[in-house]
UniProtKB/Swiss-Prot annotation:
GO terms for cellular component: host cell nucleus; T=7 icosahedral viral capsid. SUPFAM superfamilies: Group I dsDNA viruses. Keywords: Capsid protein, Disulfide bond, Host nucleus, Host-virus interaction, Late protein, T=7 icosahedral capsid protein, Viral attachment to host cell, Viral penetration into host cytoplasm, Virion, Virus endocytosis by host, Virus entry into host cell. One of its GO terms (molecular function) is structural molecule activity. Coiled coil: none annotated. The keyword Lyase does not apply. This is Major capsid protein L1. Belongs to the papillomaviridae L1 protein family. It comes from Human papillomavirus type 48. InterPro entries: Capsid_L1_Papillomavir, Capsid_L1_sf_Papillomavir, dsDNA_vir_gr_I_capsid. Forms an icosahedral capsid with a T=7 symmetry and a 50 nm diameter. The capsid is composed of 72 pentamers linked to each other by disulfide bonds and associated with L2 proteins. Binds to heparan sulfate proteoglycans on cell surface of basal layer keratinocytes to provide initial virion attachment. This binding mediates a conformational change in the virus capsid that facilitates efficient infection. The virion enters the host cell via endocytosis. During virus trafficking, L1 protein dissociates from the viral DNA and the genomic DNA is released to the host nucleus. One of its GO terms (biological process) is endocytosis involved in viral entry into host cell.
Amino acid sequence: MALWSAVPGKVYLPPSAPVARVLRTDEYVQETDVYFYTSTERLLIVGNPYFDVENRDTITVPKVSANQYRVFRCKLPDPNKFALVDKNLYNSDKERLVWKLVGLEVGRGGPLGVGSTGHPLLNKIGDTENPSFYLGEQTKDERQNVSMDPKQSQILIVGCAPATGEYWDLAKPCNDLENGAAPPIQLVNTVIQDGDMGDIGFGAANFPKLMQDRAGVPLELIDSISIWPDFLKMTKDIYGDSVFFFGKREQCYARHLFARAGQMGEPIPTENGVYYITPDSADQNNRSSHLGSSVYFTTPSGSLNTSDSQLFNRPYWLRRAQGTNNGICWGNELFITVFDNTHNVNFTISVKNDKTALTENYIDNGYKYNNADFKQYLRHTEEYEIELVFQLCKVNLTADVLAHLHVMNPRILEEWQLAFVPPAPTGIEDTYRYIKSMATKCPTAEPEEDTDPYKAYSFWTLDMTERFSSDLSQFSLGRKFLYQTGLLNGKRARTDYTAAGSSTRSTKRRRVR
């Protein structure tokens, strides 16, 4: 992009040298009229909603919370290896095929529900919303068992690269910190992975480091990092791979207003008449002897949950992406990031101590209820299904396009088996026959070629390489797409492959008398 800059004079001058311009995918990607449909199986996940259940350092029940992100990594087949019917569709010597996302529907199964999260030892003292008396001196431990319903959020992010998140973390101080001093904090970016916690009303922060009392947030967050999508950064990405489009809906209000117990690290200035008037010390009351806590906080609530405000279980048609990438899935991959806690239903399972869950007659005649005779368990379940519609497109292998793709992502050219000619050998090399013999030197370890750029991250990988179909009329989202585009009007849809823009005029039949 070309930016005009100011000079010491009173005029603005253009840049001295031309600046490279990022091309939109519509400028070098040619569409065809070939469409494919694909979908997943019913995707299910079950676990404990608050923490991992471990047995001898082995996770027996994973943490599965409605307040976690689900990041689906869809692996698509290579269209350049398709045995297409129409040989005139593209020229493999001068063109390459790519997928373009045109339709998407993320289905959520199960009923709507409002879950509860909390902490059996939450740091809160008194009710600061409508107190009836002034609290006195704090005891050593003021923690209480408090629960609340989390903030209600729905997020859908679609792109060919993982979504970027942000949170507040500890920063390195300029000088050594004193004991008990407040540390500096900084905004940190990270890749949103499957299972990361989202914001439920307490902000996006690294709670394991910021809350050393382990009593400031619910159990789901106290040992986790809460991440919020960095929409400002992703929407300003020059290539637009992280987000083709996104949907977001938030809803919350303050249910309870509390204060934190403990010593005030930054007490209110005591200058009389500025922030408050000093109470009379002769008056024996709690106001003069023990000033209340000034670290206030709220517990959120998601309020009413209805099906009228759902982002999911409805189709989305991509006509124009928000960035320069208009739905092209580079690398034959698609990332779908989902956050939805409107289906926050936690099952309570009770099992009698001296029986199993499979026992038919687990209650004996004459038994009287006793709390200690039953063990209580919690489980959270989630149900997903993803349907996609892709359009087959082709890219001309011109010099300008290859140069642009090489700057944007060199892996694209490597996957297309396009590379520069290697230089000629400069000299003779040594080759041992018995390289593993004790009489020769140790063999040189060949580094393993790592072709996965996201190997260090955790995603819910979905293999769709063998789930593509060109008969869109046989599937729900496919029929919606055909009717939406006017390709199906009560007639049988065509399933042959033709290039976009190519048409053949049939010869008129001559009428014979």
